[in-house]
A protein has these predicted regions:
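Mature catalytic core of soluble alpha/beta enzymes
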Residues: 1-290
Length: 290
């Protein structure tokens, strides 16, 4: 099959990062059903964390999607690729009404904003900022144009504008969060009546959605949004927050901002945080970590 060069490049990046995220499409289908629910009883029908039948399906599916011998995209050059699916997986898919083998899901807009930004740059448009509702930002810079980005921290079920960071040069960012931020988020989150949240950050190891922090900002001067997202996804979709892994990622050019209590921690030595939240009995401070 011959595809657009942008899609081919996306699969090249996925391959080079050793990622299996797009192959999780059948698992994402369950989460899409969950996110579209209007009440808890409906949501539980799709939730692998609460429904043992769904959990069993997810476990079986992961045995295939995490196995390159069961499913893999073969890149043939000249924008040609082939989707290889084993007979065993094809039979499993047929028996379980699986109709989608591939889905970029939450990562999709990362590739889209990168494509738009690169296309604009090729045509000498270097001013302005491209953002998406689900956390991707390409700040093009140009003529010293600055971008102020708010960083939030969830406290008692509400987002606190903990600090502000100014991007004074061209810079790309990915913002992970574990809560709905606008009406557009309704298809990417579900919040149970007890406050538990289901998000789009599915761990490919067990098929469960996770969030190691309520908020995590990752950014880079050199890498695009898709590269940042792939580098940081495992840091966020995790049972616990690994500070050492975050610092290691920062050494590779992808810096982080996150909260530890009321400390807004940042890894870039030259970064400046302002407008630290001081209200409602909360007093946020900034802390450089290295």
């Amino acid at each position: 099959m011959t595809v657009d060069s942008a899609l081919y490049s996306a699969f090249e990046l996925i391959r080079d990062n050793g990622s299996r995220y797009p192959y999780l499409a059948p698992v994402y289908t369950e989460y899409k059903g969950l996110f579209s629910c209007e009440n808890d009883s409906e949501a539980e029908e799709f939730d692998p964390m609460l429904n043992s039948e769904v959990r069993g399906f997810v476990d079986e599916t992961l045995a295939y999607v995490n196995n390159p011998d069961a499913i893999d995209i073969e890149l043939l050059g000249e924008n040609k690729l082939r989707l290889n699916v084993s007979d065993e997986y094809a039979d499993f898919a047929s028996q379980n009404d699986i109709v989608e083998y591939l889905d970029f899901f939450w990562l999709k807009n990362a590739f889209i904003v990168d494509y738009i930004a690169e296309h604009l740059a090729e045509n000498s448009y270097i001013h302005g900022t491209i953002t998406t509702y689900d956390g991707y930002t390409r700040h093009l810079g140009g003529a010293g144009m600055a971008l102020s980005m708010n960083f939030y921290d969830e406290t008692d079920g509400r987002g606190i504008p903990a600090a502000q960071m100014d991007f004074k040069t061209a810079r790309n960012a990915v913002y992970f969060r574990n809560y709905e931020n606008s009406d557009m988020d309704t298809m990417h989150f579900y919040t149970y009546s007890n406050g538990e949240v289901r998000n789009p950050f599915v761990d490919p190891k067990d098929g469960l959605c996770k969030a190691s922090k309520s908020d995590l900002l990752m950014y880079s001067d050199e890498l695009g949004c898709a590269e940042i997202a792939l580098a940081a996804y495992g840091l966020y979709s995790s049972d616990s927050f690994d500070t050492e892994a975050v610092l290691s990622t920062a050494k590779r050019g992808v810096n982080a901002v996150y909260c530890e209590g009321t400390e807004v921690c940042f890894t870039e030595a030259e970064a400046t945080l302002s407008h630290l939240y001081q209200n409602d009995g909360l007093s946020y401070s900034a802390k450089h970590v290295s």
